[in-house]
């Protein structure tokens, strides 16, 4: 039975239940039937307790614990918690060290920390009014937390008129002039600049479809606008092109020109020529006296038949039957005039026997 730890270099394993119980009684401040504080283990049964205290793993941790605390008296858990010398804000001393900003998984680890050089150094600095590592760590967290807010305020107050800090064309911000120079020399900025120049030339030309063969109506983005970089739009053909080369090829192609000519408004027609469609006789009027235009005004020819309305009546050509427009040449200087008669019922008719 090993009821003594010796100098901490060698630890004998207890054998049997009696040896384990004796070990627990002699070291009750770190061992118990339900918990091993050195290993931070919870023991829920008798068999588990025996297996744990008789294991080599437990013995190695006890040996390491003894080597750290060699020559020191064991401090009970109650005394360990009751020492408020270095506690802060009510925190448990065995769980965290506010001076070094460290947390512990067990009282053994906490005691090892408090006896180490780092804690002693930070404690001395705190007593002298210096800055400890825990204070530095907290200050770093505070700086990291406040940095995005400060950066946002700086961006909001940034002078966008300074080209070394902001590119209006690409909506890009720069931290230093070297970054701005690299941006302005890059392909992305040059492509955006060429696109804006092309759009400015086309939109400021002021040409109309009747004046220029390649007049366009483009809903182009203005320099520095938010719509920059989304393609080249041709409202005439209702398409969007991806590059400047495609746009130039489109506006110089036959499809765009045909679409442009189809949108050109037609000119108003002049008065019809003599003998045109307007020379056709209109529909006969109803009611009272007839006009003095003779039978041709009613749609009848001199022979008593209807006037033809075919293609021969266009272009000043004489109608079918050899009749010519007045004045008639001799011996036909007096054309036939129909005699209209008025009946007793008020209707107009012509005499067949005339």
Swiss-Prot record:
Disulfide bonds: none annotated. One of its GO terms (molecular function) is zinc ion binding. It is found in: Nucleus; Cytoplasm. Zn(2+) 2 binds at residues 97, 100, 113, 119. Residues 324-333 have a biased composition (Pro residues). Residues 263-343 are annotated as: Disordered. SUPFAM superfamilies: beta-beta-alpha zinc fingers. Zn(2+) 1 binds at residues 36, 39, 52, 58. A zinc finger (Matrin-type) spans 34-64, 95-125, 165-195, 232-262. Keywords: Cytoplasm, Metal-binding, Nucleus, Repeat, RNA-binding, Zinc, Zinc-finger. One of its GO terms (cellular component) is nucleus. Gene3D superfamilies: Classic Zinc Finger. Residues 270-289, 310-323 have a biased composition (Low complexity). PANTHER family: ZINC FINGER PROTEIN 346, ZINC FINGER PROTEIN 385B-LIKE. Binds preferentially to dsRNA, but also to RNA-DNA hybrids. The zinc-finger domains are required for binding to dsRNA, and also for nuclear localization. This is Zinc finger protein 346. It comes from Xenopus tropicalis (Western clawed frog).
């Amino acid at each position: 039975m090993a009821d003594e730890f010796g100098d901490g270099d060698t630890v004998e394993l207890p054998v049997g239940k009696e040896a384990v119980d004796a070990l627990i009684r002699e070291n009750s401040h770190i061992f118990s039937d339900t918990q091993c504080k050195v290993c931070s283990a919870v023991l829920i049964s008798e068999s588990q307790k025996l297996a744990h205290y008789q294991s080599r793993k437990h013995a190695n941790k006890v040996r390491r614990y003894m080597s750290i605390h060699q020559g020191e008296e064991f401090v009970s858990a109650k005394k360990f918690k009751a020492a408020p010398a270095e506690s802060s804000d009510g925190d448990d001393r065995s769980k965290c060290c506010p001076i070094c900003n460290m947390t512990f998984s067990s009282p053994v680890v906490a005691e090892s920390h408090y006896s180490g050089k780092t804690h002693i150094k930070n404690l001395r600095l705190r007593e002298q009014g210096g800055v400890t590592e825990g204070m530095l760590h907290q200050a770093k967290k505070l700086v990291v937390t406040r940095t995005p807010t400060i950066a946002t305020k700086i961006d909001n107050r940034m002078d966008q008129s300074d080209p070394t800090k902001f590119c209006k064309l690409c909506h890009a911000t720069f931290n230093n002039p070297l970054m701005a120079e690299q941006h302005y020399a890059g392909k992305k900025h040059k492509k955006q600049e060429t696109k804006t120049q092309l759009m400015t030339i086309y939109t400021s030309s002021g040409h109309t479809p009747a004046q220029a063969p390649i007049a366009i109506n483009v809903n182009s983005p203005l320099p520095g606008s938010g719509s920059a970089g989304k393609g080249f739009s041709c409202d005439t053909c209702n398409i969007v092109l991806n590059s400047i080369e495609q746009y130039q090829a489109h506006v110089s192609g036959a499809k765009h020109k045909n679409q442009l000519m189809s949108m050109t408004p037609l000119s108003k027609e002049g008065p019809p020529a003599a003998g045109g469609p307007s020379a056709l006789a209109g529909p006969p009027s109803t009611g009272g006296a007839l006009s003095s235009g003779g039978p041709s005004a009613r749609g009848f020819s001199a022979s008593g038949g209807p006037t033809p309305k075919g293609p021969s009546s266009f272009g000043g050509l004489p109608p079918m039957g050899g009749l010519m427009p007045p004045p008639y040449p001799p011996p036909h200087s007096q054309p036939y005039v129909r005699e209209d008669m008025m009946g007793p019922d008020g209707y107009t008719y012509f005499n067949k026997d005339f």
